[in-house]
């Protein structure tokens, strides 16, 4: 008998306080609560981890060695558990070979479709290429009127230069009597002399036949002989037609037969049409030049000389650095003397011809170089190779990976010139369905692709339709699922590494629905992230469909609409960190509203809200940043004006062009202007005005604050520097002569050398996951005994790293340098995290807020432009309230804050809104409306305005 609930008893993972909870099976369940309250600890680190662990444990020891076995979570028991699948926010893959098409398997079905019903065309002549068996050829010939005289020809030479004496001699030996040479019938013993410098066509007359019913096997035998002579190609030439018979055929008409996929005119051949030739991950299909990546990398002049305002002598040529190298300096001086230019003037002032010589070389022109080595002088006259050819040679010959990585910094990415970015060989791209090759189809948006497949059935013949029916069904279903999760703007060729966390999660969600599994526990992490309110309804319908297939859908979510649609809600809290970890409320949305202790309930009931500001800021004296003519990605020659000294929101449906406009164009262009040596490449635009009003532009994104466990909030914000300085000044430290390095766990001296300051020892286990155990020398404290003896208020430096931000604030309340760093972490809602918590354990939203805290603690100039891409990711509405307070504080200090956001509680507090759209992908990239929240709500064309209206009431 099936159990009705997943029963969790005694869950104590991370901050969970011995939780007991019953989760209804085969229902849509939302786990909510403040950021850091313990939602993920319950959903992912307890329930999913145990479900996955039990499944892997059930496998043989041989199979287990290839799988990662989860550690047993800190829980007494879980019953009623199903096999678990986690669909989290982590980006799918950074591998450039992984695309939306390969992840969803749509591309696999496309390959099969093209292999089975695609028609190959010659890339030279555009003629269709057919492959036929001898039996099919015989059937076609038998359709000719009886009594027709035909020649069966073997084209042994097609448009090639030469005399072909050997070939003609071989034909004589085989007994052939007549040839057609350049259109003239000739006896083989009486051939005209062939000009070896001209192109010729030579066909062997294999057989002369009058078609009737008594040919027997003669026709098939002659065809086989002809095909063998001409490498699988033969011509049938109609010499004479019966006079009394009307026919579609004409005298002297030629019919081409090929047992291979071969163009009879150009000779272009296809050896096979199988799914593998359409795979850019297979040597049979990948473009040989780019090896299936679709891109080439070339040394770029703009990367070699990144700041043209400085001189060559001062290091304008970045790979050569400053001219401290005597050899380089003497080389450049010789060039300057020869071409009459100075290496001490700004690079921008050099003539274009001099720049061309520097980059590409002097060609065959020799230059006199003088090299001095002490008392010796060596004079060499030779051409100058050029910076780019020199770098290319070094890149080709050097074996050092480090040097190759360094050289890669001076290369830019371009579409492959051989395959035009389609990744495939010519053989694959010549196969078409409805006049499109597979690369063109993969480059269409999901929405356009769905329409194309609907109309495709009308364009296929009965045979093709019969073959393609099941393939089309699979493709159409997967496209529908992608449409339902709001990804209609993506293309199948989009690289997986360029997707946001929310996009990659929804792709995997669509794939899971396509798999049709039932009896599974799905655990999802905020699937609504990055999704416009318009598409949220479709996403919820998708989650419900997953439930209706007979699965339990467990979603960590903050979205109100999702909570109202859920069958059951579990609210974890009441606060974050040590203040959370308890089940505060359970039930549907209506029940949650009435729990007084539930912060979620207070917002659902309206007892607590984020208020709309009574007035909006107008900015500094009409000063603004203007970006004109932006055309990056799908942007359609966009002009925007951002008033300075305001809180501005960039809105629009997913894929409309918000990030292309703000991150890839505005941010990168402004950064390149303010910091010319920065290695960023802005999207194309015409003009950028108003940068004289700002001195800094900062992109506060969700990338990790550190890649190693040694990075933590204290080190990132700079608080740890002041803490170490404080410990050095303690009397006991001074008496022992300790320096700052003594209190670092990154260098020798004060750290525990047994674990090298990690506090943990990694033990490799056969058939089991690696185990991390506390270092038994320092007991996990990271430092050696002598360092831990230094204490302030009875606490060692290791004790302080284990404190939460809130505790550390109280502990250092009398030390302003430390307190000011910590209070900003608390202001952004991170009071619950430990100041020494490993950076690798922080979520993207937490990492973003740590960065925001660092910016808050800096001395403000009031001339900074901050850009944040979806800062509400992972935030409860109460956390959003705190975040808005911080962002508005930055604006009140004179700065400008620009947020790309879907959350309507954030959008309604903006001073100015730029709505991009109206749709995603090709149908986006325009400015729908700009203005105050009231202006946006009044715009009928704006999807954002339609939903924003009810938030302004």
From Swiss-Prot:
It comes from the Bacteria. GO terms for biological process: nucleotide-excision repair; SOS response. CDD domains: ABC_UvrA_I, ABC_UvrA_II. Residues 320-599, 619-949 form the ABC transporter domain. A zinc finger (C4-type) spans 752-778. It is found in: Cytoplasm. The UvrABC repair system catalyzes the recognition and processing of DNA lesions. UvrA is an ATPase and a DNA-binding protein. A damage recognition complex composed of 2 UvrA and 2 UvrB subunits scans DNA for abnormalities. When the presence of a lesion has been verified by UvrB, the UvrA molecules dissociate. This is UvrABC system protein A. It comes from Rickettsia prowazekii (strain Madrid E). The gene is uvrA.
